[in-house]
From Swiss-Prot:
GO terms for molecular function: rRNA binding; structural constituent of ribosome. This is Large ribosomal subunit protein uL23. It comes from Campylobacter hominis (strain ATCC BAA-381 / DSM 21671 / CCUG 45161 / LMG 19568 / NCTC 13146 / CH001A). The gene is rplW. Part of the 50S ribosomal subunit. Contacts protein L29, and trigger factor when it is bound to the ribosome. Belongs to the universal ribosomal protein uL23 family. The keyword Nuclease does not apply.
Length: 93
């Protein structure tokens, strides 16, 4: 089972800030995290059960590092619908 260390960050972009007004938050995690494990982590560490979770797997880009090809890390993004009255402000900032 995944734990809190698999959550990398909460994303703060222009798009995610617009989603936060509607009660959504976007969380970047390691690729091995699943919806059920994220739900368990949010319940255990933050004390709430999300209403809905959508996931998106993103492959790392191929980039050049000092003339050689390298690959950035793969990760998952989760779009989490928060219950009324719950916010994750100042977490991961």
């Amino acid at each position: 089972m995944a734990d809190i260390t698999d959550i990398k960050t909460i994303l703060y972009t222009e798009k995610t800030l617009n989603l936060q007004e509607g009660g959504m938050v976007v969380i970047q995690t390691s690729p091995k995290m699943t919806k059920t494990s994220l739900k368990a982590v949010l319940k255990e560490y933050f004390g709430f059960t999300p209403l809905k979770i959508n996931s998106l797997r993103i492959d790392g880009k191929v980039k050049r590092f000092r003339g050689r090809l390298g690959v950035r890390d793969n990760f998952k993004k989760f779009y989490v619908k928060l219950p009324e009255g719950v916010s994750l402000e100042n977490v991961g900032a």
